[in-house]
Amino acid sequence: MIIQKFNRRHLAIYSIISLIGMNSCVGYKLGNNKPTHLQKVNSVSVPIFKNETLEPRLQTLVTNATIKAIQQSGTYQVSKQRNSDATLTATIRTISRRQLRSTRQNVLKTKEIEISIEVIFALQDNITGKILDKGTVKGNNTSYLDSNFQLTKRQAMQLAADDLATKISARVSEGF
C-alpha cells in the first residue's frame, strides 16, 4: 500500500517533468529551415560581385567568401547560372577604415583599426526574373596593426569579407 502511493507520486512527478520538457521543444524543427518564399530554390549561382570602391581585387575576395559561406551552410548548392534556380548578385558599395586605438606617443599613429564592408545584394529567380530577396549587409572586423601594414590590412579585409559572407548566407538561407 505504501509502495503503491510512493510509485504513484513518482509517476505523477515524472509525468509533469516530461510534459514541461516536451513543451520546451515545441518550436524546434529538424532539417532545412529555409524561409517560406525561398522553399523552391535549391541551387544558387553567385557571379562575381560589382565593386564600386577603389580597393583593388576586393570583389573576388568577397565573392569567394560568400560562395564558401553558402556552401558551408549547406542550404543551397552553388552552381552555374544556367543550372541554378536563382542568382545572387551584389554590389560592394563602401569599404571604410576607422581608427579605434592609437599609440600613446602619437595619436595619429593607429594601433587598432576597424574595417567595414557594405554590400547591396539581390536574389533573383532565374525563371521568372522575380526578386526573391534583397537587402544591405555590412561586415566588420577589428584588427591590431602590425609593422607590416599591407599584410595586416589584407588579413583584416579577409576577415571582414568572411563576416559579411556569413551574414549574406544567413539572410538567404535562414531569412535573418
Residue ranges and their predicted role:
Residues 1-25:
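Sec-dependent bacterial lipoprotein signal peptides
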Residues 5, 15, 36, 80, ...:
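Generic marker of residues within folded, mature protein domains
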Residues 32, 73-77, 82-131, 140-151, ...:
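Surface-exposed short loop/turn segments
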Residues 2-3, 22-75, 80-83, 127, ...:
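A structural "domain/chain start" motif
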Residues 135-137:
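Short hydrophobic alpha-helix segments
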Residues 12-15, 47, 55-62, 84-92, ...:
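A generic short-segment signal for beta-strand/edge and adjacent turn/coil regions
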Residues 17, 162-166:
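Short linear motifs in low-complexity, proline-biased tails and propeptides
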Residues 52-64, 110, 114, 150-163:
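Soluble non-cytosolic domains of exported or imported proteins
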